[in-house]
Amino acid sequence: MSIFRFKKFEVRNEKSAMKVNTDGVLLGAACPVRPDMKNVLDIGTGTGTIALMLAQRISALTQTTVSSIDLNIIGIDIDEDAAAEAGANFAASAWAGSLEARRQALAELSDDRAFDLIVSNPPYYDSSLTNPDAKKTAARHTDETGLSFREVLEFAGKHLAQEGIVSMVLPADQEASVLRHGRMNGLKLAEILRIRTVERKPSSRIIITFIHDNQTVTPTEKQLTIMNKGK
């Protein structure tokens, strides 16, 4: 049995094609949250790790007990096994009443609520290097088989609450493209966190956060180095 243990919850990591990984954990830990966030959507939830981290962080900011918190986090995934595993992980957590897992594609999501926070760790591998395992291909590749950040931004442009935010973790070389597609969907940059493994290397990942383009904000840039020493 594969179990990943966090400080306040555990994640079973057996069925989902996309396992617990550094990118997802960084997004769950670093994306902006506020205590007034009530409706949250995790697109491509996998094991549910990001959703669980957000439940922990948002609930910690409120003054209410876990059992009475007004928080609804939906994790969707197109893979049946992933959705089932996320659901089991949610049910075993302290925030079971605030978390819901659905086997559902983003295009099929009919929920008409406005989301205060939308997060995603979308696929990014080159589609020419597909894995023979179809489930892993869908989880890892941005093409017709899987989710793309373009879909996330298009959805966010229509379903983000007025003061809501959308945050994604992506390869650093996709920065220009994701900024362009954000603008195309009425979104503008609020924050970008550049992530590198060691100081001597360039950033390999970014956590990029957008808001509606009618909101007033001065974009911020931050740098995170994962290891203090290394090659």
Predicted features along the sequence, with ranges:
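General small-molecule cofactor/ligand-binding pocket signal
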Residues: 12, 74, 100-102, 190-193
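Conserved SAM/SAH cofactor-binding pocket of Class I
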Residues: 29-131
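Conserved Class I SAM-dependent methyltransferase catalytic core
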Residues: 16, 20, 146-203
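Mobile active-site "lid"/loop adjacent to the S-adenosyl-L-methionine
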Residues: 122-151
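SAM/dcSAM-binding transferase cores
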Residues: 197-231
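Short, structurally constrained coil/turn elements
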Residues: 5, 67, 95, 183-186
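Residue-level signal for inorganic ion chemistry
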Residues: 27, 121, 152, 210
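SAM-dependent Rossmann-like transferase core, predominantly class I methyltransferases
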Residues: 2-39, 45-57, 206-209, 219-220, ...
